[in-house]
Amino acid sequence: MAKAKKGFSRSDRVAEQIQRELAELTRKGLKDPRAGWITITAVEVTRDYSHAKVYYTVMVDSTREATQEALDSSAGYLRNELGRAIKMFSMPQLHFVYDDSVERGMHLTSLINQVAREDAEKFGEAAAGEAEGEGKAE
């Protein structure tokens, strides 16, 4: 009898656990004053678990570069703390990447809203012109 396929791979579960632990560590354990309000948005782990890309955002965009420096300099400490919290043969090297998906999403939303406004103005004027034209034809 074949085993039922699980919904998530082991690397997905490891990435999720790393994300949870890093969120807690950056909130409580990261004492670097350069680090702003950090949100860990996603973690991707390589198949061999040797590297992990950690995606993050910050509340204040002006602290973005300083936060990147703080995370890069704290990577060893965070990896060590992860090793204490998560029992793995080898903890992956952490690579921090700023997640600009929220900014891209807001930009796309503003573009969609702009086009919708332009269409409403364009078609609203055309519809008003048609209504006036119908009244004159009688």
From Swiss-Prot:
Pfam families to which the protein is assigned, alphabetical: RBFA
List, in alphabetical order, the Gene Ontology terms for molecular function in this entry: ribosomal small subunit binding
- Gene Ontology BP term (one): maturation of SSU-rRNA
| Keyword vocabulary terms for this entry | Cytoplasm, Ribosome biogenesis
Q: Which SUPFAM superfamilies match?
A: Ribosome-binding factor A, RbfA
**SS bonds (residue pairs):** none
Intracellular or extracellular location(s): Cytoplasm
Its chief place of residence is cytoplasm
In terms of superkingdom, the source organism counts as: Bacteria
**GO-annotated cellular components:** cytosol
Under the subunit heading, UniProt states: Monomer. Binds 30S ribosomal subunits, but not 50S ribosomal subunits or 70S ribosomes.
The family note in this entry says: Belongs to the RbfA family.
Q: What is the recorded function of this protein according to its Swiss-Prot or TrEMBL entry?
A: One of several proteins that assist in the late maturation steps of the functional core of the 30S ribosomal subunit. Associates with free 30S ribosomal subunits (but not with 30S subunits that are part of 70S ribosomes or polysomes). Required for efficient processing of 16S rRNA. May interact with the 5'-terminal helix region of 16S rRNA.
What name is this protein filed under? Answer: Ribosome-binding factor A
**Protein species of origin:** Chromobacterium violaceum (strain ATCC 12472 / DSM 30191 / JCM 1249 / CCUG 213 / NBRC 12614 / NCIMB 9131 / NCTC 9757 / MK)
